[in-house]
Amino acid sequence: MKPSDVRSKAFAMPLTSPAFPMGPYRFVDREFLIITYRTDPDRLREIVPEPLQVTEPLVHYEFIRMADSTGFGDYTESGQVIPVEYNGQPGGYTLAMYLDDHPPIAGGRELWGFPKKLASPTLHVNTDHILGTLDYGKVRVATGTMGYKHKELDIDEQTKRLAGPNFLLKIIPHVDGTARVCELVRYYMQDIKMKGAWTGPASLELAPHALAPVADLPVLEIVEARHLVADLTLGLGEVVYDYLAQ
């Protein structure tokens, strides 16, 4: 294969059979259980990278069911998103996500810089409540529950919240182990069609784990819980800050 052919075909690895396809990446009936809780503000400031700023001591713990997604297939994801500001613009910083499907792990890390790791999350309705779990290996590290569809939420407001900016710290090492890419990336959910939004009483339990340290941000108080169902497109990102250029 000629170098020009390599350049023209290069998108993702392996070259002859990429782990994920080119977008756009559309999700149908994407289901969220988002439990917002209050935590230790000092711990948040220790882990959120500047120039992002922590404005409130809050964490969104998310369980996301994606049964129909372009090129990524059928999978579930779970992790923590921290409300932040960037140059006065409110958004969410994704701290870590755990999922059970290789293509979105590879694509998420290589394209956007999603901090994804392999684990075993679930999200489903259990009789009268929606239940989210996260197992890392044989250890249950997160359990979230919410009463099923106790109260409807405003569709327009929830659509606006979901459409806000999201931030990622993309890190790709050089072949010698030094950082080749270290960037703050911003992306948006696009073409959102909110199909339902509900709230109800909720609980969240986090357990310690050396390699899935969700409990490092302890649950001090449940602030809000939301169950959302939406169709949406995961937009590609833009670099807003290059740490290696500073």
UniProtKB/Swiss-Prot annotation:
It catalyses: acetoacetate + H(+) = acetone + CO2. Catalyzes the conversion of acetoacetate to acetone and carbon dioxide. InterPro entries: Acetoacetate_decarboxylase (IPR010451), Acetoacetate_decarboxylase_bac (IPR023653), ADC_dom_sf (IPR023375). The active site is at 116 (schiff-base intermediate with acetoacetate). GO terms for molecular function: acetoacetate decarboxylase activity. Pfam families: ADC (PF06314). Keywords: Decarboxylase, Lyase, Schiff base. HAMAP family: ADC (MF_00597). It is an enzyme of class 4 (lyase). This is Acetoacetate decarboxylase. The keyword Lyase applies. Belongs to the ADC family. Its EC number is 4.1.1.4. It comes from Burkholderia lata (strain ATCC 17760 / DSM 23089 / LMG 22485 / NCIMB 9086 / R18194 / 383).
